[in-house]
Amino acid sequence: MALTKAEMAEHLFETLGINKRVAKEMVESFFEEIRGALESGEQVKLSGFGNFDLRDKNQRPGRNPKTGEDIPISARRVVTFRPGQKLKTRVEAANAGK
């Protein structure tokens, strides 16, 4: 099951007692800040959580899986996420008994 923005807003509403509309706007604003920073070419560091980085990938050869035809995969910029040590530790601890 995936955590959605709506569920995050609902959690803010329940734990902080703020208006649902305000909670939704807070969640949207948070992600908009991250999007804006990445669009500007900035790294996003969330202490205790992880880092969002931009990585340039070079053009490389590829293959159309349907036809088998060789086609170039164009150069592009991708977003990567590297979890912080605190997040890694908590996830490992949560999954240790499974």
From Swiss-Prot:
Keywords: DNA recombination, DNA-binding, Transcription, Transcription regulation, Translation regulation. The keyword Transcription regulation applies. One of its GO terms (biological process) is DNA recombination. CDD domains: IHF_A. One of its GO terms (cellular component) is cytosol. Residues 49-71 are annotated as: Disordered. Coiled coil: none annotated. InterPro entries: Hist_DNA-bd, Histone-like_DNA-bd_CS, IHF-like_DNA-bd_dom_sf, IHF_alpha. Pfam families: Bac_DNA_binding. GO terms for molecular function: DNA binding; structural constituent of chromatin. Belongs to the bacterial histone-like protein family. This protein is one of the two subunits of integration host factor, a specific DNA-binding protein that functions in genetic recombination as well as in transcriptional and translational control. Heterodimer of an alpha and a beta chain. This is Integration host factor subunit alpha. It comes from Shewanella sp. (strain ANA-3). The gene is ihfA.
